[in-house]
Amino acid sequence: MMQAIKSIKKHKEKKMKVAILGSGNGALAMAFEWSKAGHDVYMYDFPQFDKQVKAITAAGGIYSEGKMEGFQPVKYAGHDIKTCLKGAELVFAVGPAYSTEPFGKACAPYAEKGQIFVVCPSSCMGAILFKNALGLNIEDDSVIVSDTSTLPYAVRIIADGKIAVYNRLGGGVLLATLPSGKNDTVYDLLKPVNVCVEKAKNIFQTCLQNANPMLHPCITTLNAARIEGPDDFFFYEEGVTKGVGRLLKAIDEERIALGAALGLEIESDPHISIRQGYLTEENYDSAYATSPGFKGIKAQTQLDYRYYNEDAGFGLVLWVDLADRLGLKIPNVRAMLTIVSSIMGRDYKAEKARTLDTLGLSGYSIKELLKIL
């Protein structure tokens, strides 16, 4: 392992092979930026997601406008995971929470000793799930698996093989690693390109610093009739009022309390969002409604969307599970999960998409996990 770490230090000074798993908004932005930094980028996605893969292959790379501009080449975009992983020094898994395990399982037969994998963003302790999917115990150090608290970009695909980057974050993207003793190694590797990364204490911190489960289900629920109605509206500009903001604040305070119970300092979302470049005010209503970082984002056209299925079905479920283990009430988080489940006609908590048990951690106490992670 020491030899692998020594070689990583050299990688910062030379061209690396960087693999990107995924072909969504964030994956294209990550591929663009690492190619722009002079590295050889290889992209993989599953065969059913071939639209962007075909476009990138045809163009030979990715076009971008906004905060990152121009064209950057991609060495390979396709469905052969072995081609992407072979000899890759750095591998990013970029996608929603439900993509983490499939990506890990796809990598399992081809992962090489000493490789670094980064789940970006973690969403819900993604590094642990990814390591499980590789078939490795969380304490195994034959490969390094990290995750981040959020994406380094606000980005949308605006045409096949083309993205618009609205915000390239300048800070506030937390990074944690399994094993935690290797976090400095991964941080030093990422920092020259992803300048926004900051060191987290552990995987719990990257999980809880992600505020999407606080934001998206709440705003969606309090605007459910508008979403199901005939007219479009702007999700943040029109969807966040003073009343909505009060509920956001209550949920955020419970998220911060979860972190405190684990010995972690979790920043309020308005505070870290200012550092990230999303907000210009530190409050829970006008900050979101008037923020240039959220301007022009239309609401989803149906409730059956990732704001419920991912952010509640994975995120809030994990928060409630952690609270149960810690003996915390978090009444607003629990109420939100119950209401969302009723709206969708399904029991997200009973589905257990993401819990300590499904992460393979049921045999550990919280005290043991804090020591291991």
Residue ranges: model-predicted function:
Residues 6-8, 231, 238, 245-373:
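NAD(P)-dependent Rossmann-like dehydrogenase/reductase catalytic/cofactor-binding core
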Residues 11-66:
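NAD(P)+-binding Rossmann beta1-loop-alpha1 motif at the extreme N-terminus of oxidoreductases
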Residues 68-110, 115-118:
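Rossmann-like NAD(P)-binding element
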Residues 137, 147-194:
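Internal, well-ordered alpha/beta segment that forms a basic, Gly-enriched binding/recognition surface
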Residues 97-161:
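Rossmann-like NAD(P)(H) cofactor-binding subdomain of soluble oxidoreductases
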Residues 1-15, 96:
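N-terminal amphipathic/basic-hydrophobic helices that include classical n-h-c signal peptides
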Residues 171-271:
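Active-site-lining helix/loop region of Rossmann-like oxidoreductase modules
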Residues 22, 45, 95, 121, ...:
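Short beta-strand/turn micro-motifs composed of small residues
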